[in-house]
């Protein structure tokens, strides 16, 4: 059987219901909707963790963060980890990544870690951790912004299994990598047209991190990824290569800051969008961590320009939604260009097209913005669309639970490649376009943070179990948790933790069973004893 090509499209911080094909009546995404119309849409697809770096590692390895060990932002994925792109490359695929990677650190700022013990002998770098690895060596500094100030810097290839990479890391109009060199070649002073402090004044918008960028549309990251992806497809055909390809198009948007360029800034008016029904001050029965975030904003202590979550008003939410929709429509236009090139190149009939994201965003749910260890559905539920030209059915959807760890095994199975020992996900589509019959009874979500906040005295650690009907979340060190009936209470307003002790106990037992199931099975024993 001929191996298919793969066009793998991933966005950043993009919740499932911010697409037309997932029921959003406002945002215009005709090209992504067309992928769904030709494919299989998963309506209950969830992250392994709602954080960029570790969930991207889970996607590439098919393993939970606690197992691949990139548990949070700031911990690079080990170069010893086996990614599904490495297996594709090993079995004859051309593997390419254009856009954001984030399997290694982007920021040069130091971590938020406990202070070192005073008065003790410190281990050498090679012995500072439980495993003999030095994550400060040059091989783990390849994606740092500071590293890319060297005009001669390039990623060492193959990079986590990608034999070709054009990097565009970070977010909004603050991206860098191969993109910034490409942009500088077209606009000599482009650095003066992007970033904080260089926005075009617009009195209509005052929401945190909303900035009208002077960067032209054709130099923005989404346009770059479209142009370079189209070029890759055309070069692949022109080369006469008989090798199948896996092309990962990784968009840094619609992650904040909210900087849609040109016409996309004005495409949606805040007056035309509605804040979520739950976008209000939390009542006394709201979970303690939600009340903490709102109190932080009332006291003027919120970090409104940083990466972590903050409380928002309904007016701020409408502004941010309008700009986010503009960023999403720009991505959709870019996707349209790539799909058109796929058809024009004669590749569409043997190319599986996949669309997903690394995690969602609160976007005003419960008066919250961005992301954090509060596992509302807007954050942990993401789009996943699998469009296979060999499918006998198209335009179908499934309510079967799915997880980011399922992606690796699903891609490998379609390519006819066996998974490695320790790969934890399942094949979502054993028959082209048909969801797997062995539906899981639950999925697990992990969340390990560097920060101690939300009222916790230690860095927040959470575990969530999602079943067909409920969501249960447990926090380390807390004598309370969260339990919601997702069928009767889809907005997650009524916490049943105290009212339903029998159900709570049953779900906690299922969570432990799930954690045991997801314990590492690698390496295999090499002898009986």
Annotated model-derived regions:
Residues 1-471, 475, 481, 494-509:
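Formylglycine-dependent sulfatase
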Residues 208, 217, 513-518, 529:
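C-terminal extensions
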Residues 423-426, 519-529:
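Short, flexible loop/turn segments with low-complexity composition
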Residues 485:
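Catalytic Cys-His active-site segments of thiol-dependent hydrolases/isopeptidases
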Residues 489:
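Intrinsically disordered, low-complexity polar regions and short flexible loop motifs
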């Amino acid at each position: 059987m001929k191996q298919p090509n793969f066009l793998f499209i991933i966005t950043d911080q993009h919740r499932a219901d911010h697409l037309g094909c997932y029921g959003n009546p406002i945002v215009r995404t005709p090209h992504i909707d067309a992928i769904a119309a030709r494919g299989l849409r998963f309506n209950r697809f969830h992250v392994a963790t709602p954080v960029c770096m570790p969930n991207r590692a889970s996607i590439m390895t098919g393993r939970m963060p606690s197992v691949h060990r990139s548990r949070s932002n700031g911990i690079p994925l080990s170069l010893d980890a086996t990614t599904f792109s490495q297996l594709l490359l090993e079995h004859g695929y051309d593997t390419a990544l254009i856009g954001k990677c984030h399997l290694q650190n982007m920021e040069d700022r130091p971590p938020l870690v406990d202070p070192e013990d005073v008065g003790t002998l410190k281990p050498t770098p090679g012995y500072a951790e439980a495993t003999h690895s030095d994550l400060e060596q040059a091989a783990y500094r390849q994606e740092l912004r500071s590293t890319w100030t060297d005009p001669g810097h390039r990623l060492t290839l193959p990079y986590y299994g990608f034999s070709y990479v054009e990097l565009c890391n970070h977010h909004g109009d603050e991206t860098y990598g191969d993109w910034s060199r490409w942009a500088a070649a077209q606009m000599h002073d482009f650095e003066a047209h992007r970033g904080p402090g260089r926005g075009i004044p617009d009195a209509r918008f005052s929401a945190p991190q909303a900035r009208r960028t002077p960067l032209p549309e054709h130099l923005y990251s989404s346009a770059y990824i479209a142009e370079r992806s189209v070029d890759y497809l055309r070069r692949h055909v022109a080369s006469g290569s008989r090798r199948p390809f896996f092309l990962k198009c990784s968009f840094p948007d619609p992650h904040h800051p909210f900087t849609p360029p040109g016409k996309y800034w004005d495409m949606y008016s805040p007056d035309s969008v509605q804040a979520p029904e739950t976008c209000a001050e939390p009542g006394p029965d709201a979970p303690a961590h939600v009340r903490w975030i709102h109190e932080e904003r009332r006291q003027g202590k919120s970090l409104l320009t940083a990466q972590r979550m903050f409380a928002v008003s309904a007016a701020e939410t409408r502004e941010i939604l309008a700009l986010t929709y503009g960023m999403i429509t720009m991505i959709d236009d870019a996707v349209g260009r790539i799909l058109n090139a796929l058809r024009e190149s004669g590749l569409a009939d043997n190319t599986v097209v996949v669309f997903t994201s690394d995690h969602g965003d609160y976007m005003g749910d419960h008066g919250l913005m961005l992301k954090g260890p509060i596992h509302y559905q807007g954050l942990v539920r993401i789009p996943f669309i699998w469009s296979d030209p060999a499918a006998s059915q198209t335009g179908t959807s499934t309510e079967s639970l799915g997880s980011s760890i399922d992606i690796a095994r699903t891609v490998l199975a379609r390519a006819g490649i066996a998974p490695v020992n320790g790969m934890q996900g399942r094949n979502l589509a054993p028959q082209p376009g048909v969801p797997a019959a062995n539906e899981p009874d639950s999925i697990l979500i992990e969340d390990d943070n560097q920060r101690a906040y939300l009222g916790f005295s230690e860095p927040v650690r959470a575990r969530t179990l999602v079943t067909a009907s409920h969501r249960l979340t447990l926090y380390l060190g807390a004598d309370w948790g969260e339990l919601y009936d997702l069928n009767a209470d889809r907005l997650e307003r009524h916490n049943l933790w105290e009212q339903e002790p029998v159900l709570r106990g049953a779900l906690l037992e299922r969570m432990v069973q799930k954690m045991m199931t997801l314990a590492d099975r690698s390496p295999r024993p090499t002898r009986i004893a």
